[in-house]
Amino acid sequence: TDGLNPPTRPRRAVRPSGANDRWHFRGAGRTVVLRIGLVRLQGARHGHIAALRRAADECDIEIEVHELRKASDLAAADPHAIVLPGGESTTMRLTGNHDTSRLLPALFEWIRSDSSRPVLGTCAGAILLADPRDGGDPLVDADIDRNAYGRQADSFQSTLEATILGRDFPGVFIRAPRFESHSESATVAAMHGEEVVGVRTGNRLALTFHPELSSDTGFHRWLLETAAGAGS
C-alpha cells in the first residue's frame, strides 16, 4: 500500500557475464535504471542486496546494485544512491583508507559534493557518517557512541517508531552504537522508546540498527524512492 503500485510481474536478477560485484534487478518495462552503490569493505552485504531487491519489486523501480571496494569502483558505478552497511567500523576505516582502496575518501567527497544524494548508513555505516574522521564535517549532524549497547550477547530486537516512515518498524540491534546528541539541523528518523536510533541530515540517513535483517523494506524503499525523486 503506502500509495505505491505493486509490480506487474516478478523481478528477475541478472548477473552479467564475468561480473562478481553487480546485480541487475529488472523492472516492469521501466527504462530508467537506478544504480545503487553498496560499500563492501567489511561486514555482511547479502541482507542489503535482498532488501534492495524486495524494495525495488514493491516500488516497481529497476535497479543495479554495484559493490564498491575501491575508489575506482565508485567512479565506474556512478551511483544514484549509496548503502553503507554494518560491520566493524575500525576495520572499515583501515580498509577503506588503505592505499589499495581509498574508497572512504572518495566516498565522503562524493557525499559532500551534492547534498541531494541519498545515503543509507546502518550500524557501523551510521558511525562513519556521524564520525568520518577525515578532517571534514560530519555527514549527519549527530554525535555517536560506538558499541554503546555492548557485546554481541547484548543484541536484541524491538519495535521502533519509524517517524520518517510514519509507522512502527521491527528493529534489530547488534552491538549497536548510540546517538548521544544531534543538532537542530538533523531530523529524528526513528525512536526506540525515548532514545533516538535514526537521524537524517538532508538525504543522508543514519540508523543504529539493521533494517536489512527485517522483512520490512521501508528504509530501503525510502532510499530508492528518494533516489528516483532526485533524478526526476
Segments the model singles out, each with a brief description of its role:
Residues 81-85, 120, 173, 206-208:
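Structural motif
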Residues 168, 178-232:
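C-terminal and late-domain segments of enzyme folds
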Residues 89-161:
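Cysteine-nucleophile active-site neighborhood
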Residues 134-195:
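Pocket-forming structural segment of enzyme catalytic cores
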Residues 4-98, 217-221, 225-232:
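N-terminal beta1-alpha1 cap of cysteine-dependent amidohydrolase-like domains
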Residues 34, 61-63, 117, 135, ...:
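A structural micro-motif
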Residues 74-76, 112-114, 120, 163-166, ...:
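Solvent-exposed alpha-helices and their adjacent loops that cap or buttress functional pockets
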Residues 45, 89-91, 126-128, 180, ...:
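Glycine-rich nucleotide phosphate-binding loop and flanking beta-alpha elements
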